[in-house]
Amino acid sequence: MWLFFGITGLLTAALSGHPSPAPPDQLNTSSAESELWEPGERLPVRLTNGSSSCSGTVEVRLEASWEPACGALWDSRAAEAVCRALGCGGAEAASQLAPPTPELPPPPAAGNTSVAANATLAGAPALLCSGAEWRLCEVVEHACRSDGRRARVTCAENRALRLVDGGGACAGRVEMLEHGEWGSVCDDTWDLEDAHVVCRQLGCGWAVQALPGLHFTPGRGPIHRDQVNCSGAEAYLWDCPGLPGQHYCGHKEDAGAVCSEHQSWRLTGGADRCEGQVEVHFRGVWNTVCDSEWYPSEAKVLCQSLGCGTAVERPKGLPHSLSGRMYYSCNGEELTLSNCSWRFNNSNLCSQSLAARVLCSASRSLHNLSTPEVPASVQTVTIESSVTVKIENKESRELMLLIPSIVLGILLLGSLIFIAFILLRIKGKYALPVMVNHQHLPTTIPAGSNSYQPVPITIPKEVFMLPIQVQAPPPEDSDSGSDSDYEHYDFSAQPPVALTTFYNSQRHRVTDEEVQQSRFQMPPLEEGLEELHASHIPTANPGHCITDPPSLGPQYHPRSNSESSTSSGEDYCNSPKSKLPPWNPQVFSSERSSFLEQPPNLELAGTQPAFSAGPPADDSSSTSSGEWYQNFQPPPQPPSEEQFGCPGSPSPQPDSTDNDDYDDISAA
């Protein structure tokens, strides 16, 4: 059993790799040659807290930790061996010793580093080399007992990286130190992955922006890299694939970067940029500053870094309104607040705090209040005039473009309205009369005053009624037809004289308004039409005392309303057998209406020709002996047989007057 436990312990010790404890009187040394180093493996030595992996404090790995090498036993052979092992060329002629360790350890360098907490470096390891190669070196534990300095070296092929002209160590133009000279990087194929490598190498977090050339001030000196193409996993920028700087890439194409740990400040809510609430841009967002430790030293550093002089007043702030909160603690000698001790989103340090505010000496409002010798009104006008003029110039330029646009729009609208109005006027002048004359003609004629019932008279469209003329048939033989002693008279030699008739009386007067509404000329022979209708009443034959049968075309001869019948050779026969039919106004009205609705194609009885246009009705003076006359009387009474008789021989009749030969028509 005891044998089993012993074998198990030996196997455990062998697998763990711990060396067997050395005697108390002998130092525990481990040769570098005992640990085989092959390419690709990580060396047990490194340089930290420098500008690159080729300069800084020498650290060696002991078991699972990194320990700084003792500076008391540091020599040139060890420095040369370390620089060659790290691929940084040879060491510089004079090796430098590290200063005494400060009370507070420096911030950790890039990579997985750990710093010993020993303040006196008691028992620190030492690197002892017998030649300028790494295989001739060995690490001795607890070699230094009282020396408090650390070994430090700068190799000849030192490479460094920095960001300049960006307002801090974590933003600006990218520059590399190569062959002892600082140079820039060309922005060809420069992207966010390349900027990530830069920010991580400098300990500034991650990249927020990868900026092209001319965003920052152009650099000077050579251009060390062109077409850099990093994957984002490289530890150093010079480990990324790329090309050496060419001559065709100038400083106008210098690449830049802004890292998440970069801090920039501003003052808001004041009269100008030198007064207001303190805000810091950190990790891509704006944050407020806690006033729990906002003292004159912190305010002084901020005002100086902003170029606003010194701090004059620290007014009480408002509650925090932004997402993040930053805490600063300065001694007053720092260049920027980022060089002070700071904490971000620490609830303990910023509890029950408000947003910090500051008033710097370069503020315009403070300058106006602190110069009583200059009138405030004059100072205000002088300072604000420059700003006001810029605003007015901008607004005036906008107004100069706006006002002509409005005027042109109004003119265009007015011209369109005017053109539309002119077109409507032209259309109404030439098109409306045609529409009225051809499409909206009146269809009825108002009845006369003697009509007791409305008599609609339909007139065909576009057919104007002409005076109806009945051409009297020429007598075959005026001398042989009757014993007329009338002389032949040419009626066309002397125009007839218009006399006052029933048609032109007051009862048939058509006013001007009715004429304008009707828009057509009324036919002048309305009374003639009435007489023509009335001619349906049969008359007696003077020779044989036989009533003539009524014909479809009643015998009607146009005569003047003022004609005077003085013929003495005509035979008149009033036969008692030809009694007048009883008066029927309705029948007469219907016959009149139907007659007027018919087109004026009238025919005389017998072999009379159709109506034709001839002289006016007023020109007919019926003096021929061969004409038949019919005298109409309003409503007639049935006469007795004694009043009718056939005369034996014709005898000259006395001259009849107008009142005897013509009766007024009173029937409607």
Swiss-Prot record:
GO terms for biological process: acute inflammatory response to antigenic stimulus; adaptive immune response; heterophilic cell-cell adhesion via plasma membrane cell adhesion molecules; immunological synapse formation; innate immune response; lipopolysaccharide-mediated signaling pathway; positive regulation of cytokine production involved in inflammatory response; positive regulation of T cell proliferation. Residues 18-402 are extracellular. Changing residue 351 to N: Adds an additional glycosylation site and impairs interaction with ALCAM. Its main location: membrane. The keyword Phosphoprotein applies. The modification Phosphotyrosine is found at residue 662. Disulfide bonds join 54-88, 70-144, 83-155, 129-137, 170-204, 186-249, 199-259, 230-240, 290-350, 303-360, 330-340. This is T-cell differentiation antigen CD6. The lineage of its organism: Eukaryota, Metazoa, Chordata, Craniata, Vertebrata.
